[in-house]
Amino acid sequence: MKLLAIKVECSYELEDGLSFFMQDELDAQGIESRKRSDFVLEGQKHDSSLVELDDIENLPEDLELTAYFEYKNADKKKIIQKITDKIAEMKGYGLDAGNVSISTKEVADEDWNTAWQKYYHVIDFSRHLAIVPEWEDYQPAFSDQQLIRLDPGLAFGTGGHTTTQLVLLAMERALVKPMSVLDVGTGSGILAIAASKLGASHVLGTDISDEAVTAAKENIALNNIDNIDVRKANLLKDIDEKYDLIVANILADILLELIPDLDNHLNENGKIIFSGIDYLQLPKIEKALEENNFVIKMKMQEGRWIGLLIARKPN
């Protein structure tokens, strides 16, 4: 099967929003995100044989985002126009699009299935967690370091993005055994797996995408974990249970939809972790939390991305 690859070179500020749009709205079969800084820094830190420096030199200074579509069903001109319109919309929110360039090419499906693996390598996140591709042999750097093994497949998170790492950082601080955890928008399942590894008694991961549910289940199986359930759900709809910790690494506009339903799904003294928030969108998140009787206990920032640890206001 042939695939149509549409490559967008732009500012990293568009990464989350544009990735979500191409996957969710345009039904991309896969998303590949590459930044020169990611590979150079990780290559220097881990000396990974998966990092090919010759290829790095060909990367743009900012972001290269490639979406893959089934060739026979793809309307190339229509897709490019929709991407162009979305970029214009995001610029209207105040995001810097950088120097935008869009190009296309045909690729063989079998080439994609293995070629992307060379860009995915160990992320030695902390003394407690390391994210490891399932084909790599990696020994923990610390005796108590937990390994999260992932096969990211065609799409979904690999743990390398700042927004994911902000959640992991907050989870290391906030998750206490034996908390129950709800991961809204689980994607690859990385946060659900991390919660289990950090001592959660039970974890539920939800996603609106059938493909994400399948990917998460496969990654959970790779880690031999039996206390995580995954189901298809739209945010908190059809979720009846309450949890000690709710995590959501999704776009700010979707977090705004989530906030009014949080109280009904949070146990007494429960906590919430948000990420995926561009700093320009933080004021409206803060306003919605205030209006729904929540208070921010900890704020984390890396670049323009914000992570929040949230609790109910004290009585």
UniProtKB/Swiss-Prot annotation:
This protein's UniProt keywords: Cytoplasm, Methyltransferase, S-adenosyl-L-methionine, Transferase
Primary site of residence: cytoplasm
Cellular component GO terms, alphabetical: cytoplasm
InterPro entries to which the protein is assigned, alphabetical: Ribosomal_L11_MeTrfase_PrmA, Ribosomal_PrmA_MeTrfase, SAM-dependent_MTases_sf
GO molecular function: protein-lysine N-methyltransferase activity
EC class name: transferase
Protein EC: 2.1.1.-
Record-listed S-adenosyl-L-methionine binding positions: 164, 185, 207, 249
Compartments (UniProt record): Cytoplasm
Ubl conjugation among keywords: no
GO terms classed as biological process: methylation
Catalysed reaction, written as an equation: L-lysyl-[protein] + 3 S-adenosyl-L-methionine = N(6),N(6),N(6)-trimethyl-L-lysyl-[protein] + 3 S-adenosyl-L-homocysteine + 3 H(+)
Function: Methylates ribosomal protein L11.
NCBIfam families: prmA
Family: Belongs to the methyltransferase superfamily. PrmA family.
Protein name, UniProt field: Ribosomal protein L11 methyltransferase
Species of origin: Lactobacillus johnsonii (strain CNCM I-12250 / La1 / NCC 533)
Annotated gene: prmA
